[in-house]
């Protein structure tokens, strides 16, 4: 949130918010592990059964305009280095009419920024020496619409500017629009993404969080069982189609982040 919103809030505002939303009807209790169901039910009733139920307001999905038009901003923040952030309005699993596109965006994020062998670090950082670091991220499990984000820090030792970094990021996106990844690159990225999910499921805590997160945003925990099949179904053509649909100026927000000392 924004600091000016927090500064305007009162204790009464916070209590009303808490009373409105923090109730059993708006909670998800997840228990994972080697437990006896009957014993768990007894413990749940003992520790949570006395909490009174309250009506819960209908929660609306936070939807965004598909193509709000190109937006640009410059922010002067407490940071040592400049940064370029480029975001695109995209749907999530909750709001998409084509879930294959969402899984394609997941793989695009991994293809661009998923590790040292990904395109942004390999091409922009090591080959072209334009950036000191670059990353991408996308949350497919948002309660409403989501953002596909790219960020990069220019190589100031080489005198690279934010405008040059911005142009380089767009070139990487346009490369996906013009030419789909070859099968070998897609399989490598897919294997890395699935492997990271498999390792994460070794953690009981991570399992509980994943189940709770899906149910809380309105998706089924059973998506975990079909997730790998969904990723495996994505083709190079799906990657190209998603890049063409979503990575457009009309969906984009560009932010130049500069140190406060650079303010004119």
Enumerate the predicted regions with their spans.
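M16 family metallopeptidases and their MPP-like homologs
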Residues: 1-4, 26-32, 82-95, 122-233, ...
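Short, solvent-exposed loop/turn segments at the edges of secondary structure
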Residues: 22-25, 67-70, 78-83, 102-103, ...
